[in-house]
Amino acid sequence: MDVMNVPVDSERDNPGDKVETQSDKNHLPKASPSQSQSPVNTSLHNGDGKDNGVATEPVENKQILSERSVTRDDYEKGKTIVSSLALSSISGKDGSISSQNAEGLSSSSNRPLDVNDALSYLELVKYYFSERREIYNRFLEIMRDFKSQALDTLGVINRVSELFNGYPQLIEGFNTFLPSGYKIEVQLDSSNTSVVRVGTPMHPLPQQGVQSTLPVAPSNEDQRTMESTSPTDSQPQPSAPNLVSSTENEKPRVDFNYAIAYMNKVKARYPPNSDTYMEFLGVLRTYQKAQKSIFEVRARVAEIFKDSPDLLEEFKLFLPDNVDSTEPSTPNVQKSPNRLPPVGNFSLPPSAPVREKRNRPAHSAQISRSISKTSRMYRQTAEEPLNSYSLHVYPQKITAPTSPYAATQEELLAFTTIRQHLPDTLAFHKFLELLHLYREKLLDKTELLNSFSKLVRNDNLTLWFSEFIRWSDNPILVKNEPVDERVYLPETFECISLTYRKLPDSWKQDKCSGRDDLDNSVLNDDYISVAPKPSHVKNIMHHENQYLQALQLVEDERYDYDRVLNTTESAIKILANFCEPTIHEHLETALQELERSKRIIKNALIIVYGKEHANLALDTLFKKLPTAAPVLLKRIKTKDQEWRRSKREWSKIWRQIEKKNAQAAFDDRYCRIEGRDRRGLSYSRILRDIDDIYQRQKHRIDGAKLGFQFTQVLCDSLIFLNILRLSDAQLTNSSFYSYADKGRISAVLKALLSQFFGIPLPREALETNLASENIESVKKHRDGLSKIFIRPESADNSNNTNVSFQTDETQTEDETMSDIHPDDVENHSKSKFLGEESKNIIGYNFFGNATMYVLFRLICVCYSRLEHIKLFVESSTIYASSTGGYENILNICEKYLKGSCSRLEFRKYLQKFNNETCYMICSIERLLKVIFYRIHEILLDPKLGQLLLLFESDGANSVTTPREQMVYRNHVESILAPESKIFNMRWYPLEKRLCIQQLLPADLTMHDFENPAKAFMYYVDSYAISHITEGVDLMQVKMPFLRRSLQRISQQGYLAGRGSGRLHSLFNEHFCKSNLQLFFSTDTYVIFFEPNTENVYINSYNLWVDQSSQSKKQNRTTNWRRWLESDEGWRKSKANTDIKFFSETTLDQCIEAM
């Protein structure tokens, strides 16, 4: 049959095929000019490379092929696929052995696979199916799947056998692409029917002399079993000759898992670092690489494992069957020049790592490599002739496993079912990893079942797998035995020597039952080792600070420059010797000298050119020394000069950094104080400290009671004046704030100290600070805050909530109440309870938010440090006379804050005291900066300014009632809303004591009562005012309003009020005035109201109802009118005449008729 040849048209190629062809052509050899011409005239070859006499002839007239015929494009695609398959099967894309066709793919005759054989087979396929394009395309698809490892070897054999049914020459010719150990034979059975027989590494085809003795009985059951079994799932079987000679004495085959278990057993017996284990691995590697006899390996292993007969017996399972019965001197043994098969079917561990690693599941590539290595034992040496018979596929029958380590039929069925259910090979590998983890006892049955259920996501299969692994859902019973509470105190044990103590009999544990006499004589159960701890040795740890780190960074940079410059300088000296004109005369001596100094030159080239190009430059230097040396020398000199110039520039910066940080780096005391202040004086840390104490009091931890969380005695008023003196010095030298801000900050600090702590300040000093803001001189001593913070004139400019409140004395006077007996009401003796007895000297109260609390705490910290220094200097006569006393310290601090004294001089002066307390003043600059920052934050927030105004009007009264304090607190809460947490700073002027308490809405304003009567009166006062009663759970309070009568302000109404400019009326829509006075008895709780007193509450919410409320109101009106006009309304039980009369009569007529 003639085959028409069509010239290749590259423009018609598929772009995807072009890319694949281009990537695969990199592996193909260059074609001769005769092969590159078109049309191609090529002779066809069979699988053996012999000419079959069929050749193509050129056709002069081009004919248009039908769609069913094979075109030239299809042939080129096929050439690309089979060529790349042949080459990639020998070596992968990266040069390594592929996992599908591992260990050298070759033909069945042990002849290396050639690309020409693959192309010849493609020519043969094209010859037979030139008019049947669909079969040719199906063949290319099979080859693509085989190349991408989508099909295993048995799968591609089955598909090719079905595709080429009736073409035995093509079926047997496919042996060209099969890995070693796999072989296809087409033979004729006794009934003149062609039979396709497949040989695998685990099931090799029997020899021809035994074929007549052991016929293969085909069956449908065997065929199904063979099709569902992959090479990795196949079980080892004895070959046909061994079955004929001896079936009873056959040695059981071992699988891959047993090989891993054997290696782990050897590791457990002999550690990986031991000489025995390394010698055993060396024997295995020698057997793999060198041409050693299997008898030599056995003798060497027997010598290594002479003390472990069990390991030697297990090792014999991995040897071939004829080793035990045949001696090395037998003349029948034929020594093949090829390499011998490996011992067993396990891969050798690497020799580089010496430490033992954790066992991991074997990769699929390792399994395939080990199987392919084992397949060499069964490689056939004789080649079967090709016959032309019809095709009937009858796979080889699988016999029952005979190895005790082999899988049973139930396990084979289980693995087959699971693999068919899993979507891909990756999921099956995950399943194998789970089994490996379970085998290594890293997973129990429950964890294995849970992981398997997540992997397969099939309830039936999970239930079957649980029965297969015999999982039981019985709960695990753990004995609840108490832990031994013995305390390990080696100091109490008997001392045997300096480092050993003898254990008491009660501490001795039960000995292991597996010990023998040798173990008991060697192992120690009576003594323990204790490290000695001399009393004079202290563990001194060195703490690095930021200044020391800066110096270390400078030294690292200087070291890098020195290392680079020393390397380049040495390289320049060496290369200068190779640039002489007479280098050609003694070139060999120069190369030897270059070899000795290769490391120095390479380091210099890496610095100049980088690692990537350094090796290339070094190779060029060795090859062309006379020409390359001057070029490299010039380049290295140029970079050396640049780096030296850069080092000189950086040296100036390094000197400045060292001068700035040298003293501070070694002043460890200052670094510790600075780091402590940076953490302890932070905003969040101060709030967290008081909140921790509050939580301990609230939950009664360690018997704590509710009360103040912070208390400090501030008895020296002169220290407050010193704080103001240092703050003025700091503000004078500060460039962070403007001139106006400096005056306001100083005025706020002075006014706060004078009003809250009662510090008598000179009036001129306060007026001077206020004049900096163009404020009029103060009239009274306590009007400083009112001059700094402008009081809001109306509710329009205030930041209050929608409930208006009165800050004057009206409300406090109207909300006056007392506790009298009902019998005293007639006598109007309530003045007794309104007199001086209701007044208590409780000190000044200042309610503020977290910012105010942090400011007071910072002032206390500054006071505490100055007080400690003053007490230390006054108590020590030596420092008082030598350093000038406390006043001299203040002068030095003032000079330091103003900038006339350097930081180094200031620290040297403080070091004279040699006291940690005095040295705390070194961070006074940072402390004052934080105080100024908090005051500036108060100036920027209008709400905080209102808090100071409230304190000036309500809080700064030493003689007040509890009810007035509650009203003052409610005012503060309304200003700070929605912020719920407030702080109460209380100053007791007689005791000179400051107490701070954190308050939540449910906490009481006052908590220290002398007797229960005082507590009851406090409750009555809280109940009488218009705000929420303190100490009452709001969840238990039932409001006396119907829910349907309450209407809220909608967002639409709010927007309407804002657009109309009437937003102030929206906030003031609630009006409340409490003037009602009542009296009740403490015994009977009978309430008596005072005449001519009342409470007024006005709610104008109807002005701001939304559209939905209006529609509801109209609907109610319409429904009411409909009912009124109906028969059930006013017409009910009336006569028709009356109805007609009332319908026609107007309201005026009705009135006149009446």
UniProtKB/Swiss-Prot annotation:
GO cellular component, one term: Sin3-type complex
Pfam families, per the entry: PAH, Sin3_corepress, Sin3a_C
Coiled coil: none
Residue ranges with Low complexity bias: 228-241
PROSITE patterns: PAH
Domain of life: Eukaryota
Positions of the PAH domain: 111-181, 252-322, 403-472
Stretch list, region Disordered: 1-71, 91-110, 199-249, 321-376, 797-824
Biased composition (Polar residues): 32-45, 100-110, 323-337, 365-376
GO molecular function, one term: transcription corepressor activity
Location of the protein in the cell: Nucleus
Listed Basic and acidic residues bias regions: 9-27
SUPFAM superfamilies hit by this protein: PAH2 domain (SSF47762)
Protein keywords: Nucleus, Repeat
GO biological process, one term: negative regulation of transcription by RNA polymerase II
InterPro entries: HDAC_interact_dom (IPR013194), PAH (IPR003822), PAH_sf (IPR036600), Sin3-like (IPR039774), Sin3_C (IPR031693)
Protein name, per record: Paired amphipathic helix protein pst3
Organism: Schizosaccharomyces pombe (strain 972 / ATCC 24843)
